[in-house]
Design a protein with these regions (language model features):
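Charged phosphate-binding loop/patch that engages nucleotide di/tri-phosphates or the phosphate backbone
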Residues: 100-133
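Functional cleft and adjacent loop/helix regions within the main domain
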Residues: 17, 23, 132
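N-terminal strand-loop-strand
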Residues: 1-16
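Generic cytosolic/nucleocytoplasmic N-terminal low-complexity/intrinsically disordered segments
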Residues: 4, 17, 64, 82, ...
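Unchanged
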Residues: 21-109
Length: 133
């Protein structure tokens, strides 16, 4: 499980890579780009896991965000946090470690769902097989 640690404003703590869809991008392209930008990891999408929403206030206005989550396989164990965005650390963790490190409950739930999908694929000997797109 790939996580990164942020120290910007109130978001101190470990989180999953995510970001905003840029014009002309699909959700899949955004997910891959954000993983690369935020952690410098190269990955490929295995399966769509689900969608979550969260909200916060900015200048007394509520902002609601939707995040589409994907189970991915990294090419290796390299990661480097994106310092320009105030990320101070990144790394790969076992499920139980990642679960306890994550700050936000909705990300813990998505992590559980992704882990269940991973276990299903692993039990069928389908994890780690490079699929053609």
């Amino acid at each position: 499980m790939l996580l990164y640690k942020s120290y910007k404003n109130r978001y101190d703590g470990w989180v999953l890579p995510k970001g905003t869809v840029e014009k002309g991008e699909t959700h899949e392209q955004t997910a891959l780009r954000e993983v690369k930008e935020e952690t410098d990891a190269n990955a490929r999408i295995i399966k769509y896991v689900g969608k979550s929403e969260y909200s916060f206030y900015s200048f007394h206005e509520q902002i609601v965000k939707s995040v589409h989550w994907y189970l991915m396989e990294a090419e290796g164990y390299h990661s480097k946090p994106q310092k320009e965005e105030f990320f101070v650390d990144s790394g790969y963790y076992k499920f139980h470690e990642a679960y306890h490190l994550l700050k936000f409950p909705n990300e813990k739930e998505i992590l559980k769902e992704a882990y269940e999908e991973y276990k299903k694929l692993k039990s069928k000997n389908q994890w780690g097989i490079r699929q053609r797109r």
